[in-house]
Amino acid sequence: MGRTLENKQKIVTEIKSLLDDSEMAVVLDYKGLTIKEMSDLRSRLQTTNGICKVTKNSLMRKAIDGDSNWNDLESLLTGTNAFVLIKEDVGGAVKAIQSFQKDTKKSETKGALFEGRLLSDSEIKEIASLPSKEVLMAKIAGALNGVATKIAISINEVPSGLARSLKQHSEKSES
């Protein structure tokens, strides 16, 4: 039984909502993947706040129509597509996709769209090599903490140095 117009409109609305919440979209050719393998991909993406959505290209076209952030996605809408919509941990989700592809050797990445720009395969791989947001924040916090510690030591050193100088001067005066 075919989908009704109302059903299709609900799907388009759902896709629009998912796209509004997403930072990046990766388009995969899922031809040849089993249901078990698709479930495996979805479970790998859950930890990174990514969603794998299989939908007709025509419905995705309607969802991105008029949205300048996602318009370039249209060039990837041919064949059998699974759309991985990534909300937060972009690097982690891309790593999960690449790990899945390495394990199954069945799906290919057709392309990705990040901040309104199509990415090449090499750019997608670069994103996967980036540390997670938490790791970057920890590095920044560590660097800031190091600077604060150095400032505190420097500020504390001035009175200590002055006190040592005065003590040495008073000891010389007494002798």
Swiss-Prot record:
Keywords: Ribonucleoprotein, Ribosomal protein, RNA-binding, rRNA-binding
InterPro entries: Ribosomal_uL10, Ribosomal_uL10-like_sf, Ribosomal_uL10_bac, Ribosomal_uL10_bac_type
GO cellular component, one term: ribonucleoprotein complex
Biological process annotations from GO: translation
SUPFAM superfamilies, per the entry: Ribosomal protein L10-like
Domain of life, source organism: Bacteria
Quaternary structure, from the entry: Part of the ribosomal stalk of the 50S ribosomal subunit. The N-terminus interacts with L11 and the large rRNA to form the base of the stalk. The C-terminus forms an elongated spine to which L12 dimers bind in a sequential fashion forming a multimeric L10(L12)X complex.
A Pfam family it matches: Ribosomal_L10
Source organism phylogeny: Bacteria, Bacillati, Cyanobacteriota, Cyanophyceae, Synechococcales
Name the record gives this protein: Large ribosomal subunit protein uL10
GO terms assigned for molecular function: large ribosomal subunit rRNA binding
Family per record: Belongs to the universal ribosomal protein uL10 family.
Entry function: Forms part of the ribosomal stalk, playing a central role in the interaction of the ribosome with GTP-bound translation factors.
